[in-house]
């Protein structure tokens, strides 16, 4: 939680961006296409930004995109960092700290996730109502910098009730069926076993993945309002009698691309108005 490193990265970006972004977006596996919709786009590879890690996963482009989306000034992570890549939680969540330093107050996080709830189908979009941190760690462990947030942040509303309602209203308006449920984060990179999925279901999980929770914890610590959306890219282990592959994840996110774009763009449009 090095404030100097955060400020260096933010200063570098402030010199590139004409105004402060209002909304930050983090795009998960195969969902980076949203960044292509941004107008007056300024694209900056992660490797150019001081102190930024670099994404190593297929389906993650590895650049920050600033510009206009549906009437809002946004900054978008096209490709995120994962704990399983060998980064510390501090590095995984560093971009969220930088977004806050740039002036972002609202964050939309997206991911590809395995469906644990047996009523879900691949291609469903799920509004995250809450999460379970099953990663065995927390990005806030260590000394707390009170300039960045309080020592013991409240997580009773990790995902903004207001933004969840806004997203449900938007889905209704555009005629899109969306789910709502609890996202469980594991470290990965191995997919879960059928026994682990049964455990997650008993714990109250509806979808499972390997990201999002660290970023959300840090966003809440920083006082940001958060909306989370999972694309159910496959059914989790043991539900269907077939092995899981990353290719399947990318394939499903390709199919659901149009719905995802429509949904997130309409959400941003409504957030810009409110």
Curated annotation (Swiss-Prot):
Q: In which pathway does it act?
A: Purine metabolism; purine nucleoside salvage
Q: What is its EC number?
A: 2.4.2.1
One of the entry's Gene Ontology molecular-function terms is:
purine-nucleoside phosphorylase activity
Organism, as annotated: Geobacillus stearothermophilus (Bacillus stearothermophilus)
Q: Which residues carry this modification: Phosphoserine?
A: 29
Q: What is the official name of this protein in its record? A: Purine nucleoside phosphorylase 1
Q: Name one GO biological process term.
A: nucleoside metabolic process
> Binding residues for a purine D-ribonucleoside, per the UniProt record?
192, 234
The uppermost taxa in this organism's lineage are: Bacteria, Bacillati, Bacillota, Bacilli, Bacillales
Complexes and interactors: Homotrimer.
Q: What family is it from? A: Belongs to the PNP/MTAP phosphorylase family.
């Amino acid at each position: 939680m090095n404030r100097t490193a955060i400020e260096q990265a933010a200063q570098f970006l402030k010199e590139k961006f004409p105004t402060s972004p209002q909304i930050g977006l983090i795009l998960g596996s195969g969902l980076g296409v949203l960044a292509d919709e941004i107008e007056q786009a300024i694209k900056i590879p992660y490797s150019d930004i001081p102190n930024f890690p670099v994404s190593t996963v297929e389906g993650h482009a590895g650049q920050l995109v600033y510009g206009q989306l549906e009437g809002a000034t946004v900054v978008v992570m096209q490709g995120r960092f994962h704990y399983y890549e060998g980064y510390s939680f501090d590095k995984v969540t560093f971009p969220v700290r930088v977004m806050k330093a740039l002036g972002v107050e609202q964050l939309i996080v997206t991911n590809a996730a395995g469906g644990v709830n047996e009523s879900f189908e691949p291609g469903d979009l799920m509004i995250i109502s809450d999460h379970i941190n099953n990663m065995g760690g927390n990005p806030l462990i260590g000394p707390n910098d009170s300039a960045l947030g309080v020592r013991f942040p409240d997580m009773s509303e990790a995902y903004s009730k207001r933004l969840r309602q806004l997203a449900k209203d938007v889905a209704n308006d555009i005629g899109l069926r969306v789910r709502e449920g609890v996202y469980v984060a594991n470290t990965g990179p191995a997919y879960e076993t059928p026994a682990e999925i049964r455990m997650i279901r008993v714990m109250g999980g509806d979808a499972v993945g390997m990201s999002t929770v660290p970023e959300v914890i840090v966003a809440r610590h920083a006082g940001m309002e958060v909306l989370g959306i999972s694309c159910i890219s496959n059914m989790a282990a043991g539900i269907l009698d077939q092995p899981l592959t990353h290719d399947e994840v990318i394939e499903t996110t390709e199919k659901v691309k149009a719905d995802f774009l429509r949904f997130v763009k309409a959400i941003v449009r409504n957030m810009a108005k409110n």
